[in-house]
Amino acid sequence: METKQERETGRSSPDPSPRKLIRRAATWEISDSDNEEETNKPQTESRKGPIVNIEATDQLLGVQKDPAQQPDVEEKTKNLVLPPPTSTTPSPTRRSRKKKTPEQVAAEQEQAEEKKRQRELKRQEKAQKKELEKIERERRKETNLALKLLRPDQCGKYMVVKVDAGLLEDAGSEDVLEALRVAEYNYSIEPHSVPQSISWRREMPADWTCIEGMDMKEEEEDQLLVLVEPKSYLSSVRTYAQAPYYFCVGNEMEEIPGSVFSIPAKNPHKKVTLVIIGLQEYRWCERLSRQIQRQSLDAAEGRDSNKDQSATRATRQQIQEALVFLQLHYNTEVLCLDTWKELGQHVCAVTKSIAQRPFRKHWEAQTFSFCTSAGSWRGWGPRGVLTGLPLTWRRQIQQLNRVSPAMAAVVSQAYPSPQLLMQAYSACGSDRERMSLLTDLRIPQDNNTGVTQKAEDPREVADIAQEGDQVPGRERRIGPDLSRRIWLLMTSKNPELVLDLNS
């Protein structure tokens, strides 16, 4: 009974304590029935929104509530839930993949293999390109090293002058050997098939690499120099004068004993040069001896002997005819010298020419050094200067004889390309007008000295033609000669035409 009364008094007490009214659980107790409800009603729980603690929210906002109403609020908040959202997005459905056919799988595999092959081919091409570039660099390096041995200042070291032992019988041969020693050329004394002759041989180092496109051979050169006595040469000329037609038939001249004309026929693979020392002196002495003989004899006997001697000696006309015959039929030159010293100088000059022959042929086959090659990244000078076609065109004009950089600059400024010059030629009415088209182009002069401007570097004469109108004083022109040569250069179809009449 007391317990019930105490409960009734506690409920009817007007001012109960807040601690007794609000009781908070330290922990949440979950019973077995809750689990059963969750399993039985999964959809209803998922639809319920999150539970909001209004009491904690009011405390944060500073709202004071009536303590008498707090138990009811607590009971309401336990079952209070947020309404479900009005717009719900449906969960994405998993896309079902279509099963590929075997043909599609095979096509995809083939496409993947094709891409793999393409990548492999590109990789191989790239590696091959690098290997070719490496080989090209090595080849250029070897070529440059080989060209160093063939430069004009180095090529003479590998030439050997072969002198026949019979040539040393004359006392003047010492002048020839002394000239070779002064020029620092190697020589050797060896017996030759042709007596009193000189030949040349090139001896390259063992580690020298042959350059592609260069005709190099480590053997005797095709030049042969033969020393001929004046008496033997004049005797051969008299024999030729007596039977000129007999000499022109094949190699019949080989049967004539003592004839120097048979030497070129016996050596067809050689470029033979006949050297005669003291021919004029010998003929003068021969003429003097005949005069002495005529004076010692009687008048009648002298006339008879004069007829006999005139029939046996060679005249100047016969000597000239023999020279023409040797030049035309055997491509043989005859060199008349006065002293052995001149012969030594000639041998040194021929040695130098033979030594430089491969180097000259190699550079003649190359393009101009001022042209930019296809694979080169460097131009001619920095940006902004004259490059490419204008520079090549200017240098081409400057290749002509007696053409200064200033003259070439004037022509290239008036007609910046060869095609423009050809169009100007086609616009002319006659050949005379075309020939004199460039005659009146003025060459500018220096303001201070009045001398025509000169420039070693074509970059320094880029604006020479533009300054010509402002230069006072006497002015030079291109002139008719250079105008005619340029016209012939651009229009002539004759490869053997000589442009410079003064050369």
From Swiss-Prot:
Key word DNA damage present: yes
GO cellular component, one term: Holliday junction resolvase complex
Keyword GTP-binding listed: no
Listed Basic and acidic residues bias regions: 1-10, 38-48, 112-135
Nuclease-like domain: annotated span: 70-366
GO biological process, one term: DNA recombination
A GO term for molecular function: DNA binding
Coiled coil (residue ranges): 103-151
Main localisation: nucleus
Compartments it resides in: Nucleus
Gene3D superfamilies: 3.40.50.10130, Crossover junction endonuclease EME1, DNA-binding domain
Top-rank taxon, per record: Eukaryota
Region described as Helix-hairpin-helix (2HhH): 388-503
InterPro entries, per database record: EME1/EME2_C, ERCC4_domain, Mms4/EME1/EME2, XPF_nuclease_EME2
Region called Disordered, residue ranges: 1-135
Sorted UniProt keywords: Coiled coil, DNA damage, DNA recombination, DNA repair, Nucleus
Role description: Non-catalytic subunit of the structure-specific, heterodimeric DNA endonuclease MUS81-EME2 which is involved in the maintenance of genome stability. In the complex, EME2 is required for DNA cleavage, participating in DNA recognition and bending. MUS81-EME2 cleaves 3'-flaps and nicked Holliday junctions, and exhibit limited endonuclease activity with 5' flaps and nicked double-stranded DNAs. MUS81-EME2 which is active during the replication of DNA is more specifically involved in replication fork processing.
UniProt family annotation: Belongs to the EME1/MMS4 family.
Assembly, per entry: Part of the heterodimeric MUS81-EME2 complex; the complex forms specifically during the DNA replication phase of the cell cycle.
Name of this protein: Structure-specific endonuclease subunit EME2
